Structure formats: structure tokens, C-alpha cells
UniProtKB/Swiss-Prot annotation:
Cellular component GO terms held in the UniProt record: cytosolic large ribosomal subunit
Coiled coil: none
Summary of subunit composition and partner proteins: Part of the 50S ribosomal subunit.
Keyword Flavoprotein tagged: no
Record-given protein name: Large ribosomal subunit protein uL16
Pfam families referenced in this protein's UniProt entry, alphabetically: Ribosomal_L16 (PF00252)
GO biological process, alphabetically ordered: translation
UniProt similarity note: Belongs to the universal ribosomal protein uL16 family.
Cross-referenced InterPro entries: Ribosomal_uL16, Ribosomal_uL16_bact-type, Ribosomal_uL16_CS, Ribosomal_uL16_dom, Ribosomal_uL16_sf
GO molecular function annotation: rRNA binding; structural constituent of ribosome; tRNA binding
Length: 144
């Protein structure tokens, strides 16, 4: 699973995800993409599950790009432990995703296959998403 090799600080504040994504909102690599429509933290496990769903559905043809990286450590205290005594240990890593952010990109596969692969991936993610195409019109993809 994805996680940083090295970080400046071991633990992070929870924070809030405000506003729309400034960067990473256009397709830069592939012809088709999966775009987030709402703010949410996406865990490394969810990204990996979505990646597996896509690669299995397209039967390893074409090329897949993951456009988000889980760089936020999420800490958790163990079960049945009293409050206080410091912050809990890091439980998992997550990516803060803002609306408009491209999560995955695909190239080298037909449009309808890309759309169905992204729909399967969307089921693994905690955000509402939509399929976008480099050349605008997504009516030929079906589903949307």
C-alpha cells in the first residue's frame, strides 16, 4: 500500500477539507479519468482496492495512473483506553481529496471499458465521483 517513505512530522492534525481542488483537476496523462465530486479523506487501502478493481476489469491492458497519494497520518487510540496520555499511534495513511480532483487516469482502453472500470473503482471509494474524458463528451461512455 502507498505511504510516504519519510515525513517531517510523525503525526498530523485532523484539519478540515475546505474549498475546491486547485491543482490536479485536469487529465494530464490518460484519455479518461475518475474525478471526485465531494471532499473526503481517502485511505491507502481504499486507493489500493480501487486500483485492483480497475486493473482486474481492464485485464491489465492499457495504462493506469494514480493521481492521489496518501500523505496524511491518521492516528487512533486503542480500544478501551482512557482519554489523555497523549495522542494515539498512527493507524493508517490517507489522502485529503477536494472536489474536482482527478483520482485515477486510464489510457489505451476503449471508452466504455474505462467507464465500467471506473464505476467498479468508485464503489470502493468513499466519495461521489464522475467519469471524465479528455475530449469532453462522455455520452458515448454509458452510465453517466
Amino acid at each position: 500500500m502507498l505511504q510516504p517513505k519519510k515525513t517531517k512530522y510523525r503525526k498530523a492534525f485532523k484539519g478540515r477539507i475546505k474549498g475546491d481542488a486547485k491543482g490536479g483537476t485536469t487529465l494530464n496523462f490518460g484519455s479518461y479519468g475518475l474525478k471526485a465530486l465531494e471532499p473526503e479523506r481517502v485511505t491507502a487501502r481504499q486507493i489500493e482496492a480501487a486500483r485492483r478493481a480497475i486493473t482486474r476489469h481492464i485485464k491489465r491492458q492499457g495504462r493506469l495512473w494514480i493521481r492521489v497519494f496518501p500523505d496524511v497520518p491518521v492516528s487512533k487510540k486503542p480500544a478501551e483506553v482512557r482519554q489523555g496520555k497523549g495522542k494515539g499511534s498512527v493507524e493508517y495513511w490517507a489522502a485529503r481529496v477536494k472536489p474536482g480532483r482527478i483520482l485515477f487516469e486510464l489510457d489505451g482502453v476503449p471508452g466504455p471499458l474505462a467507464a465500467s472500470a471506473f464505476e467498479r473503482a468508485a464503489m470502493k471509494l468513499p466519495v461521489k465521483t464522475k467519469v471524465v474524458a479528455r475530449f469532453g463528451d462522455t455520452s458515448h461512455l454509458g452510465g453517466n
